[in-house]
C-alpha cells in the first residue's frame, strides 16, 4: 500500500526559511577531480571516471552581516527572538536550527529542505548525522516511504544510504553522482574505537 502525503504549509515554510537565508547564492553544480588512489595508474582517457560533484561554497558577497540580517528577518516573522550573532563551530560555518515538535514531520521537512536547496542553489550533497542507530533506521525508512511523493513534486529522486565503513563504494558514488545524495550516519561512528571506525579518517588505496 502506498502512503499518501499532504502538503503542510508549516513544513514548506520551514524549508523556505532555510532557502531564504542564502538568497543571492547562484545556482551552480561545480565538479572536481576525485582522488584516484595511490595505486592508480595514470590514463589520460578516463578523467571522466574521476569527476566528482560538490556543493558550491557560499559566495563572498553573502557576508556574515547579510546572513545574520536575513536570519533575524525570518526570526521576527516567526515571532522568535532575533539572534545577536551567528552560531558556528570549527567544522560548521553556519549552524541553523529549525525547532519542531515531535510527530509533526521533522524528517519530511528536512528532506523537503534538501530538495529546495538543490532547486534554488544546486546543492546536492547532504550528510544527516543522527544520535542513535534506532533513529538512523527511522530516517532511512522515511526516505524510502517519501521517495515517490517527492519525485512527483520535484521530478527527481534523492539517492540515500546508510554509512558503512565496509562499503566504501557507496562513499565513492556519493562523491561521483551528479544527482541529490544523502548519507545517513549516526554520531557514534565518529567517536567509536577500532579499525573500522578509523576508516572514516584514513586515506585508502580504493580511493
Task: Kindly label every feature range from the protein language model.
Residues 1-207:
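RecA-like P-loop NTPase motor core of helicase/translocase proteins
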Amino acid at each position: 500500500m502506498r502512503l499518501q502525503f499532504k502538503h503542510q504549509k508549516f513544513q514548506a515554510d520551514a524549508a523556505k526559511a532555510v532557502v531564504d537565508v542564502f538568497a543571492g547564492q547562484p545556482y551552480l553544480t561545480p565538479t572536481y577531480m576525485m582522488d584516484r588512489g595511490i595505486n592508480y595508474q595514470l590514463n589520460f582517457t578516463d578523467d571522466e571516471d574521476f569527476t566528482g560533484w560538490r556543493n558550491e561554497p557560499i559566495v563572498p558577497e553573502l557576508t556574515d552581516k547579510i546572513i545574520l540580517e536575513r536570519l533575524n528577518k525570518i526570526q521576527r516573522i516567526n515571532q522568535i527572538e532575533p539572534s545577536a550573532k551567528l552560531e558556528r563551530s570549527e567544522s560548521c560555518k553556519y549552524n541553523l536550527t529549525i525547532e519542531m515538535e515531535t510527530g509533526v514531520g521533522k524528517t519530511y521537512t528536512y528532506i523537503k529542505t534538501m530538495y529546495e536547496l538543490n532547486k534554488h542553489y544546486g546543492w546536492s550533497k547532504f550528510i544527516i548525522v543522527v544520535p542513535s542507530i534506532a533513529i538512523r533506521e527511522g530516517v532511512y525508512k522515511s526516505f524510502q516511504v517519501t521517495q515517490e511523493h517527492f519525485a512527483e513534486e520535484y521530478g527527481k529522486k534523492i539517492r540515500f544510504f546508510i554509512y558503512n565503513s565496509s562499503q566504501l563504494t557507496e562513499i565513492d558514488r556519493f562523491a561521483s553522482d551528479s544527482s541529490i545524495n544523502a548519507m545517513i550516519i549516526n554520531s557514534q561512528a565518529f567517536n567509536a574505537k577500532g579499525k573500522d571506525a578509523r576508516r572514516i579518517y584514513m586515506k585508502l588505496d580504493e580511493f
